[in-house]
UniProtKB/Swiss-Prot annotation:
It comes from Frankia casuarinae (strain DSM 45818 / CECT 9043 / HFP020203 / CcI3). It comes from the Bacteria. Catalyzes the interconversion of L-alanine and D-alanine. May also act on other amino acids. This is Alanine racemase. Its cofactor is pyridoxal 5'-phosphate. Substrate binds at residues 144, 326. The modification N6-(pyridoxal phosphate)lysine is found at residue 46. Keywords: Isomerase, Pyridoxal phosphate. One of its GO terms (molecular function) is alanine racemase activity. PROSITE patterns: ALANINE_RACEMASE. It catalyses: L-alanine = D-alanine. Pathway: Amino-acid biosynthesis; D-alanine biosynthesis; D-alanine from L-alanine: step 1/1. Its EC number is 5.1.1.1. GO terms for cellular component: cytosol.
Length: 384
């Protein structure tokens, strides 16, 4: 099955494609569920399933054993409901004035980090005549969303009052790690301790949440003391390790699901001293063959991959030669026998010797999350 995303031209499968192995998603989620032990597993499918396609990957994740789905934005959660998913869905990032009523009507769980979110959820619940399912979020050390230690008691008290009124039900208490991908970092145990304190404060306020959740991919894999009632793996749903300090995917039974492939658009012989691409950041040192590859930064290939990242072409890894352009980049293939139409593998699981998303991340000084999630709308996803 090939999915044409908004902005992708029909019929360009031969040119470029992100092949998504849904069995790899199922296999990886099954491994995560096993790691979670008695805790339930929420598959995080935000950002269009980290670039892999939210709907097909959500379905595969549930087949692999997940029982919850998680999104950042309300429209993502509503799209899951529109696609027929009935499992619990948590959406956690909204601004004042967003359509909480639509979310409540669709049985989407909401997150509240501040009083305004509780008030808007309660107001929407009164309008719809339905009880809002809410997860209170504590900032235990990430310094991002979540109520601070000083504000947490008041948030719990407000939640308890609205629960007593019958307009909300506090389903969960949750937080998020700052350094879970560095399991020896002292903040990890510190955040677990502060999360336990936050749960105690919620209990003293009269709340009895059924799910307490803290663990992301890294904590799901290596910090069982952080599992509580529910774990929330994200990048590892798609077979990727959350960081080099955690270990390679295979160490945990994970398999990378995305392979980004295209085909050379042109090959040509050029003399020594030929400047290549914008600003001539690469110059040939001898007579050689150049290959033009029809993917660029508009497709999610970072411009910083200029003269840095490698691809597999003609049976060998080759470094990008010169500036990555909006729609294309160039390879210097020397005297090797290649032709227009030959396959170019940018990254994948590594089975054929191609670079992995981890290789690209290391070369570019970023994380594998960014490499896969930025693959653009012009690149069709083909599901296998």
């Amino acid at each position: 099955m090939t999915e044409q995303r908004a902005g992708s031209p029909a019929g360009n499968d031969l040119r470029s494609c992100a092949v998504i192995d849904l069995d790899a998603v199922r296999t990886s989620v099954t491994a995560l569920v096993a790691r979670a032990g008695d805790a339930a597993t929420m598959a995080v499918v935000k950002a269009d399933g980290y670039g892999h396609g939210m709907i097909p990957c959500a379905r595969a994740a549930l087949e692999g054993g997940a029982t919850w789905l998680g999104t950042a934005f309300l429209e993502e959660a509503l799209a899951l409901r529109a696609a027929g998913f009935t499992v619990p869905v948590l959406s956690w990032l909204a601004a004042p004035g967003e359509s909480f009523a639509a979310a409540i009507a669709a049985d989407v769980d909401l997150s509240a980090s501040a009083g305004w979110a509780l008030e808007e959820a309660a107001a929407a619940a009164r309008r719809t005549g339905r009880t809002a399912r809410v997860h209170l979020k504590a900032d235990t050390g990430l310094g991002r969303a979540g109520a601070t230690e000083a504000d947490w008691p008041a948030l719990c008290d407000a939640g308890a009052a609205l629960e007593a009124e019958g307009v909300i039900e506090v389903i969960g208490v949750w937080s998020h790690f700052a350094f879970a991908d560095a399991p020896g970092h002292p903040t990890v145990q510190g955040q677990i301790g502060r999360f336990r304190d936050a749960i105690d404060i919620a209990t003293k306020a009269g709340l009895h949440p059924s799910v307490r959740h803290l663990a992301n991919s890294a904590a799901t894999l290596v910090s069982p003391e952080a599992h509580f009632d529910l774990v929330r793996p994200g990048v590892s749903v798609y077979g990727l390790s959350p960081g080099p300090e955690i270990g390679p995917p295979a160490a945990f039974g994970l398999r990378p699901a995305m392979t980004l492939t295209t085909h050379a658009a042109l090959t040509k012989r050029v003399p020594a001293g030929t400047g290549v691409s914008y600003a001539h950041r690469y110059t040939t040192t001898r007579e050689t063959t150049l290959a033009v590859v029809p993917l660029g930064y508009a497709d999610g290939i970072p411009r910083s991959a200029t003269n840095t990242a490698e691809v597999l072409f003609g049976g060998r890894r080759r470094r990008i030669a010169g500036t990555v352009c909006m729609d294309q980049f160039v390879l210097d293939v020397g005297d090797d026998q290649v032709a227009a139409g030959d396959e170019v593998l940018l990254f994948g699981p590594g089975d054929r010797g191609e670079p992995t998303a981890d290789d690209w991340a290391a070369a570019l000084g970023t994380i594998n999350y960014e490499i896969v999630s930025r693959v653009g709308a012009r690149v069709p996803r083909r599901y296998v």
